[in-house]
C-alpha cells in the first residue's frame, strides 16, 4: 500500500515477482577453438569491433581487415574479409547495424555504410557533421550531429537522410546532455513489457 502525504489517501498495488530460472553463477561457457578455427593469431592492440549483420558476425580489426563467421552454432568457421573504401580515420568502435546494413563514422564526422560487411561507400547525404551513431532500432537509426558547435540527437529512417535538417533554421532537435558517451561505445538493446525498444549505452 502507498499512503499519500495527507495521511488519508491510500492506493493499493499488486506486485508480481518473476524468478530467474538460470543461476548466473552456473552459466556454461564453451571453448569455441574446439568448434572451429580462430580468426587470427595476431595480437591487435588497436581498435576492434564485433557487430552482427544478418546471420553473420563480423569482427573489424582495421580499416582494411575484418573476420566473419556464421552466428549459427553448427556453422562456426572464421574467414578473412578484405575491407574496401573505409578511410584510415574510421572509428571501428562506432559500427552499428540498421536495416540490413552496417554503418561507421570517421574522425572527420562522415558516415560510411556497407550491405555485405566488405565493400563500403560514403553516405554523403548524412553530411559531414556526424559525431556518432547511437543505435539501429527497428524503424530508425539514431545518432548525434553537430550544428553550430553544439551536439543534437537526430534520427534517420531511410539510411540516407536525417529526419530533421542539419540547419540552425527552425531547429527542433534535442541537445545532447553533457557527459553523454560518444566514444568507445557498447550498447545493449531490449524491449519493455509493452514492446517499447530501449537501449543501454556505455562509453566515454
Report residues per predicted region.
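Beta-strand initiation motifs
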Residues: 22-31, 73-80, 118-122, 160-164
Amino acid at each position: 500500500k502507498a499512503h499519500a502525504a495527507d495521511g488519508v489517501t491510500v492506493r493499493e498495488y499488486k506486485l508480481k515477482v518473476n524468478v530467474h530460472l538460470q543461476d548466473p553463477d552456473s552459466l556454461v561457457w564453451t571453448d569455441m577453438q574446439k568448434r572451429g578455427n580462430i580468426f587470427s593469431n595476431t595480437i591487435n592492440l588497436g581498435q576492434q569491433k564485433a557487430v552482427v549483420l544478418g546471420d553473420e558476425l563480423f569482427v573489424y580489426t582495421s580499416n582494411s581487415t575484418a573476420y566473419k563467421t556464421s552466428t549459427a552454432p553448427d556453422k562456426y568457421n572464421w574467414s578473412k574479409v578484405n575491407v574496401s573504401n573505409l578511410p584510415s580515420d574510421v572509428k571501428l568502435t562506432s559500427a552499428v547495424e540498421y536495416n540490413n546494413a552496417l554503418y561507421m563514422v570517421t574522425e572527420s564526422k562522415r558516415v560510411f555504410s556497407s550491405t555485405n560487411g566488405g565493400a563500403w561507400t560514403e553516405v554523403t547525404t548524412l553530411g559531414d557533421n556526424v559525431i556518432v551513431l547511437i543505435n539501429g532500432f527497428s524503424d530508425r537509426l539514431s545518432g548525434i550531429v553537430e550544428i553550430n558547435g553544439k551536439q543534437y540527437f537526430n534520427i534517420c529512417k531511410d539510411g540516407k537522410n536525417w529526419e530533421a535538417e542539419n540547419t540552425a533554421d527552425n531547429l527542433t532537435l534535442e541537445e545532447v546532455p553533457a557527459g553523454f558517451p560518444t566514444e568507445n561505445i557498447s550498447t545493449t538493446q531490449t524491449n519493455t513489457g509493452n514492446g517499447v525498444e530501449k537501449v543501454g549505452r556505455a562509453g566515454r
